[in-house]
């Protein structure tokens, strides 16, 4: 059940289970519902509760923590990860055969290689080239080790600038607070900014329009390692992100709702 109302989704799943549905999944965006219902959701007849914003926040946080990763997906209760990497000139993976890859990183599986417009299902005879996008799968622990070995020249993200203080920002801050980064959020609505400031005392909250280039310059956008645009308007997110790239911010993440 994925209606805009959490209560309707939960009730629909309860009813569906009583009518014989074997599996029921409810989209629940309110974190309070997720916390209170999790302990007894199965007895109510809800097999799984999903929170799109929370999952997005976790993905964004992982991308920030591991700058070389272009995308990351988790499976098996977050114990298995599929990551996408672009092979750079100075990467130890450049010009490596998959036979050599298997010898060196035996616990990691190369699932796919994307080379320009071509998608390659790899065999041992394939060679990884500069510019390839490779998709590798492994346990969470082995992926972390693999990342450290292959991204040793990558500078860790120490500071993050976020524009927009919506629900996704709250979830993202919940995750990032454990990463020991300097975080600044620019939010144009006073009430939301004050609530963020009260909820996250270690995060610097600025009242202003984060899509205004003058404000971004004033807040020192060029000094940040990562920039995340989470306003409610796709066009504003894209324009702000392009400006961040012009300012040589290392990692830029943009929220786009429209496909």
Please report, for each region that a protein language model flagged, where it lies by residue.
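Cytosolic regulatory regions of ion transport systems
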Residues: 1-259
């Amino acid at each position: 059940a994925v209606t805009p109302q959490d209560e309707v989704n939960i009730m629909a799943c309860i009813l569906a289970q009583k009518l014989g549905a074997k599996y029921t999944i409810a989209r629940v965006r309110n974190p309070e519902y997720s916390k209170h219902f999790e302990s007894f959701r199965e007895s109510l007849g809800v097999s799984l509760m999903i929170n799109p914003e929370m999952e997005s926040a976790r993905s964004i946080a992982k991308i920030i923590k591991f700058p070389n990763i272009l995308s990351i997906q988790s499976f098996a209760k977050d114990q298995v990860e599929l990551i996408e990497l672009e092979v750079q000139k100075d990467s130890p993976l450049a010009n490596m055969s998959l036979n050599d890859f298997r010898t060196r990183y035996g616990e990691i599986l190369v699932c796919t290689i994307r080379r320009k417009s071509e998608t390659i299902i790899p065999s041992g005879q394939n060679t990884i080239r500069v510019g390839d996008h490779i998709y590798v799968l492994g346990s969470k622990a082995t992926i972390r080790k693999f990342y450290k070995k292959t991204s040793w020249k990558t500078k860790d993200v120490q500071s993050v600038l976020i524009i927009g203080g919506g629900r996704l920002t709250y979830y993202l801050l919940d995750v990032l607070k454990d990463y020991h980064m300097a975080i600044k959020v620019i939010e144009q609505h006073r009430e939301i900014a004050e609530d963020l400031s009260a909820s996250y005392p270690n995060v610097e909250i600025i009242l202003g329009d984060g899509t205004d280039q003058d404000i971004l310059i004033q807040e020192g956008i060029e000094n940040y390692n990562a920039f995340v645009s989470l306003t409610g308007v796709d066009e504003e997110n894209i324009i702000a992100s392009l400006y961040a790239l012009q300012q040589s911010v290392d990692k830029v993440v943009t929220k786009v709702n429209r496909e």
